[in-house]
C-alpha cells in the first residue's frame, strides 16, 4: 500500500474517532440535561399524576441509562478496534519505510549485474525484428574495470568493461564468419558505404576484436565504427557510451601509431562527440584535443576532404564562441582559441574542391558563412546546390532542414 494511501487512511480514522468523541460529549452535555429538565413541568398536575410522573421518570432514567451504557460499550469496542487498526497500520508503514530503501538497493544491484536489461534504441529494435535465431553473446573479457586517465586529463573507464554494457543485436544472422584481416577490412569498408549497413559493419568488427585488436588498420576502423554507432543511435545514454568507448580506443590507436593519419582523424572526431556531454571545462578540453589531432591528421593526409570539412566546422564554432568560453579556454591552455568565418569558409570550399558535392552539410555551412559575410547571392547559390543533393544520412536530413531555414531568412 503506497505511503500516501496510509496517510489518508490514518487521517480518516482520526477524523472518525474525533467525531464519535464529540457525539458522546454532546449527549452528556446537552441531550441528557434537557431530558431531566422536562420532568418538573409535570409536577403541578396533582398527586396522582405526580406519582405516575415520578415512576415514569424513574423507569425512563433506568431505561435510558441501560441504553446509554450499551451504546457506550459499543462505541468503546469500535474505538478499541479502530485504535488497534491504527497501531497495525503504523507498524506496516514503519516496515515499508525500512524495506523500500533495501528493495531499491537490491534492484540497483540486480541491474548492475544484469546489463542486458538496457533499453534498446529504435534502430536496435528494428534490427531485432529481422533476427530469426537466438543472439550469440560474445564471451566477456577478463580485463580489469579500473579507471585510466585519458589524454584529455579526465577520467574514463577502461574500454572492455564499457563495451560489454551495451550489447548490440545481430543485424543479419548469428553466425560469426572468421575472416582474414585484409578480407575483413575490405568487407567492412564496403558495408560502410551504405548507411543501412553501418551497423553490420560495426558488428563485424566487434566479432573480430579479440583476434585483431593489436592491428592498427583494424583499430582505427573500430574507432570509426563507434562514431557511426553514435550517429545511428537516438538514445542519449547510448550515444554517450559509444562516444566514450570510441574515444578511449582512439587514444590507444594514436599511442600505438602516432604517424597514422586515420588514427588522428577518428580520434579527433570522437573527442568532438564526447564534448557534447561534458561541462564547459571538459568541452573546451575536448575542443583543444579535436583541433590538435585534426591538424596532425591534415599534415599526414593532406588530400582527405573530411578533414577540411571538420576543420571548417571547428573554425565556424570558434568564431561564434562567447567571451566567457574564450576566457575559460585561455585559463586552461594559456591561449585564447581564435578563428574567423573567413577561415571556416576557406576550409569548406577546400572540401568542395577535393570532392565536389561532398555533402548537404558542407553546402549548408558554406551558405551560412556567406550569410554571415553579407553575401546573399553566394548564399543562395549554395543553398540551391544543397537542395539538389540526395538525403542519405541523418546529418543530411538535419542539414536540409537548416538550408530551408536559411532560404527563409534570405527571402525576408
From Swiss-Prot:
What membrane topology is annotated for this entry? Single-pass membrane protein
Q: Does the keyword Transmembrane apply?
A: yes
Protein's name in the database? Regulator of microtubule dynamics protein 2
List the Gene Ontology MF annotations in alphabetical order.
microtubule binding
Per the record, the major location class is: membrane
Q: Which residues cross the membrane?
A: 9-28
Which residues does the record list as Phosphoserine (modified residue)? 51, 121
What keywords is this UniProt entry annotated with? Coiled coil, Cytoplasm, Cytoskeleton, Membrane, Microtubule, Phosphoprotein, Transmembrane, Transmembrane helix
Between which residues do disulfide bridges form? none
Quaternary structure per UniProt? Interacts with microtubules.
| Subcellular locations according to the entry | Membrane; Cytoplasm; Cytoplasm, Cytoskeleton, Spindle; Cytoplasm, Cytoskeleton, Spindle pole
Q: Which residues carry this modification: Phosphotyrosine?
A: 154
> Where, if anywhere, are coiled coils annotated?
72-110
Source organism (scientific name): Rattus norvegicus
- Report the family membership: Belongs to the RMDN family.
- Which stretches of sequence are listed as region Disordered? 122-153
Q: Which InterPro entries match?
A: RMD1-3_a_helical_rpt, TPR-like_helical_dom_sf
Disulfide bond recorded as keyword = no
Amino acid at each position: 500500500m503506497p505511503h500516501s494511501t496510509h496517510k489518508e487512511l490514518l487521517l480518516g480514522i482520526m477524523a472518525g474517532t474525533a467525531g464519535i468523541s464529540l457525539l458522546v460529549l454532546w449527549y452528556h452535555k446537552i441531550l441528557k440535561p434537557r431530558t431531566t429538565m422536562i420532568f418538573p413541568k409535570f409536577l403541578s398536575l396533582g398527586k396522582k399524576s405526580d406519582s405516575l410522573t415520578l415512576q415514569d421518570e424513574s423507569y425512563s432514567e433506568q431505561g435510558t441509562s441501560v441504553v446509554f451504557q450499551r451504546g457506550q460499550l459499543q462505541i468503546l469496542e469500535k474505538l478499541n478496534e479502530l485504535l488497534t487498526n491504527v497501531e497495525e497500520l503504523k507498524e506496516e508503514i514503519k516496515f515499508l519505510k525500512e524495506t523500500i530503501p533495501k528493495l531499491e538497493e537490491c534492484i540497483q544491484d540486480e541491474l548492475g549485474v544484469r546489463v542486458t536489461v538496457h533499453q534498446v534504441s529504435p534502430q536496435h529494435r528494428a534490427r531485432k525484428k529481422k533476427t530469426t535465431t537466438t543472439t550469440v553473446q560474445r564471451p566477456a573479457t577478463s580485463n580489469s574495470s579500473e579507471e585510466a586517465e585519458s589524454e584529455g586529463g579526465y577520467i574514463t573507464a577502461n574500454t572492455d568493461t564499457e563495451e560489454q554494457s551495451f550489447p548490440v543485436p545481430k543485424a543479419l544472422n548469428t553466425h560469426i564468419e572468421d575472416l582474414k584481416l585484409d578480407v575483413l577490412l575490405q568487407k567492412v569498408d564496403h558495408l560502410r558505404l551504405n548507411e543501412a549497413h553501418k551497423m553490420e559493419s560495426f558488428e563485424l568488427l566487434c566479432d573480430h576484436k579479440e583476434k585483431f585488436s593489436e592491428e592498427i588498420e583494424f583499430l582505427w576502423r573500430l574507432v570509426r565504427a563507434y562514431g557511426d554507432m553514435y550517429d545511428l543511435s537516438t538514445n542519449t545514454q547510448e550515444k554517450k557510451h559509444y562516444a566514450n568507448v570510441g574515444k578511449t580506443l582512439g587514444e590507444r590507436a594514436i599511442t600505438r601509431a602516432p604517424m597514422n593519419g586515420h588514427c588522428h582523424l577518428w580520434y579527433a572526431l570522437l573527442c568532438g562527440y564526447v564534448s557534447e556531454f561534458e561541462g564547459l571545462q571538459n568541452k573546451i578540453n575536448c575542443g583543444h584535443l579535436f583541433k590538435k589531432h585534426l591538424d596532425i591528421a591534415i599534415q599526414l593526409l593532406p588530400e582527405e576532404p573530411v578533414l577540411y570539412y571538420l576543420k571548417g566546422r571547428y573554425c565556424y564554432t570558434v568564431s561564434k564562441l562567447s567571451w566567457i568560453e574564450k576566457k575559460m579556454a585561455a585559463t586552461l591552455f594559456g591561449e585564447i582559441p581564435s578563428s574567423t568565418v573567413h577561415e571556416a569558409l576557406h576550409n569548406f570550399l577546400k572540401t568542395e574542391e577535393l570532392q565536389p558535392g561532398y555533402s548537404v552539410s558542407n553546402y549548408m555551412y558554406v551558405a551560412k558563412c556567406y550569410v554571415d559575410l553579407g553575401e546573399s547571392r553566394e548564399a543562395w547559390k549554395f543553398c540551391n546546390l544543397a537542395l539538389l543533393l540526395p538525403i542519405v544520412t541523418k546529418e543530411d536530413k538535419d542539414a536540409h532542414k537548416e538550408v530551408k531555414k536559411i532560404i527563409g531568412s534570405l527571402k525576408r
